[in-house]
Amino acid sequence: MPRRAFRVAYDGRPYHGFQRQPDVSTVAGELFGALRRLDVFDGAKPPGYAAAGRTDAGVSARAQTVAFDAPAWLTPDAFTGALPDPIQVWAHADAPPEFHATHDAVARTYVYYWYAPDSRATDDRAAGALDRLTGTHDFHNLTPNTTNTVRELDATLDRDGAFRVITVRAGGFCRELVRRVVSLVQLVTETGDTDRIDTVLGDEPVAGPDGVPPADPHPLVLHAVAYDGLSFTVDEDAAERARTTFRAARADHHERARVAGHLASI
């Protein structure tokens, strides 16, 4: 069978992360279950399988990318039909036989939605803190990883209504790096302690109460994954199904937020 790649969007909140784990529900576990039900494979995992990234529990994705050897009849729409609503496959690409969704990715982009409705006065401080984390640094104090911690980040902050939107792009990321970058920016924005950034980026380990914890995973989205020479085709039926599903989820959340706002008026 030919190697094929698929774009996957998912609401990560119901899942214990992307990567398969025993005894808990994960996005990859749901993908494998769907493929087994469709008789695409019957082993431990599909031949040639790899994914662009391993998002943490609660993190969502717009363009997670998985690739494996798959029959031509497996369209995104057919794939989605065997999946639960929070997971939607919406595009596909024919890939070379040696294609690897992890190793062949040239860039990954994450977006973090920081709810800050009453904090416009400190937007410049937040942007300045993020700017100091942009570029090439050793982020050993912002990840549990102990090796390969030097990364080059391109990060920006924009205001969108009640939200500060942080966009971070890199060739690859250490574990929890984006969430800890956001957490550090939030701390510096709140306290004005810009020296904290120099300490965290320094050579000495920063741990315990002085360490930087990861920010809440729920506002984080894996927005894009780029590959050289790979052209994805949007399955319009699958894409429309995804839009309808996520619009319904958005409406539900708006209603819940309105009720919570009413209760907060006590």
Swiss-Prot record:
GO biological process, one term: tRNA pseudouridine synthesis
Sequence similarity: Belongs to the tRNA pseudouridine synthase TruA family.
EC primary class: isomerase
GO molecular function, one term: RNA binding
Known catalytic reactions: uridine(38/39/40) in tRNA = pseudouridine(38/39/40) in tRNA
Name of the molecule in the record: tRNA pseudouridine synthase A
Keywords: Isomerase, tRNA processing
Pfam families: PseudoU_synth_1 (PF01416)
